[in-house]
């Protein structure tokens, strides 16, 4: 039985082979290959990425609301600020206007960096909610879905980065990723302190998911406009 290659993988390989033929081009600000080349492959990748990022945003919002319903019925945490999110940084734009002013290569790295900062999300949730009173299983199930979405988003964006790095060498540089700083809170034996840490985790996740969804669409408009 002959195994057929996955369509997205075949398209990506075809594109990369084409890119190798014109990698000596000094500067290509936008992917402009015609007749089914770069534009179509990037548009295909962005279609998938946009859909997943919207689902990521929706699920993160639902997870935060589930947390409020299950563990904060009196709005104790909703009426007080969460701890500073671990992804808060001068290099990460905090609104769409700032993101729109960024160069595509820089914005792509920002999105990948934000997603990588949540690579241990499932570990934190499973480890720190298992002993809480209540029924956190619905929340944990959604976090498992979110974890898979983060991995898919990262894979798609890395594929886009592979393509664009042919004309944007700076994209090949490795990034350092911030890690969540709330672990000391959720490891406390006091339930209220644990819940404060988990509230901050889910609030920051929701905030970042919203940004990722917005920034993916901004990036798409910069790289494959009018598609």
UniProtKB/Swiss-Prot annotation:
Pfam families, per database record: Hormone_1
Tissues where this protein is expressed: Expressed specifically in placenta. Highly expressed in invasive trophoblast cells lining the central placental vessel.
Molecular function terms, GO-annotated: hormone activity; prolactin receptor binding
GO biological process, one term: mammary gland development
Record's GO cellular component terms: extracellular space
Domain of life per record: Eukaryota
Localization per record: Secreted
InterPro entries: 4_helix_cytokine-like_core, Somatotropin/Prolactin
Keywords, sorted A to Z: Disulfide bond, Glycoprotein, Hormone, Secreted, Signal
Main location: secreted
Glycosylation sites: 47
Signal peptide: 1-27
Cystines in this chain: 85-204
Family per similarity comment: Belongs to the somatotropin/prolactin family.
PANTHER family, alphabetized: PROLACTIN-5A1, SOMATOTROPIN,PROLACTIN
Name the record gives this protein: Prolactin-5A1
Organism: Rattus norvegicus (Rat)
Lineage, top ranks: Eukaryota, Metazoa, Chordata, Craniata, Vertebrata
């Amino acid at each position: 039985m002959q195994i057929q290659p996955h369509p997205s993988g075949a398209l990506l390989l075809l594109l990369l082979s084409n890119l190798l033929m014109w990698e000596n081009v000094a500067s290509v600000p936008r992917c402009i290959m015609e007749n089914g080349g770069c534009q179509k492959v990037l548009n295909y990748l962005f279609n998938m990425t946009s859909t997943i990022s919207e689902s990521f945003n929706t699920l993160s919002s639902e997870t935060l609301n589930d947390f409020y319903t299950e563990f904060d019925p009196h709005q104790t945490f909703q009426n007080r600020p969460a701890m500073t999110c671990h992804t808060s940084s001068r290099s990460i734009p905090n609104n769409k206007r700032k993101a729109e002013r960024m160069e595509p290569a820089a914005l792509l790295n920002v999105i990948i960096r934000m997603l990588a900062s949540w690579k241990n999300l499932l570990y934190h949730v499973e480890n720190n909610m298992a002993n809480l009173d209540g029924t956190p299983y619905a929340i944990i199930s959604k976090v498992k879905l979110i974890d898979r979405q983060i991995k898919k988003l990262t894979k798609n964006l890395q594929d886009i980065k592979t393509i664009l790095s042919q004309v944007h060498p700076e994209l090949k540089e490795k990034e350092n990723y911030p890690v969540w700083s709330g672990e000391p809170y959720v490891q406390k034996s006091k339930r209220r302190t644990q819940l404060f840490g988990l509230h901050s985790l889910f609030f920051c996740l929701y905030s970042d998911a919203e940004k990722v969804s917005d920034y993916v669409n901004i990036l798409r408009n910069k790289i494959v406009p009018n598609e």
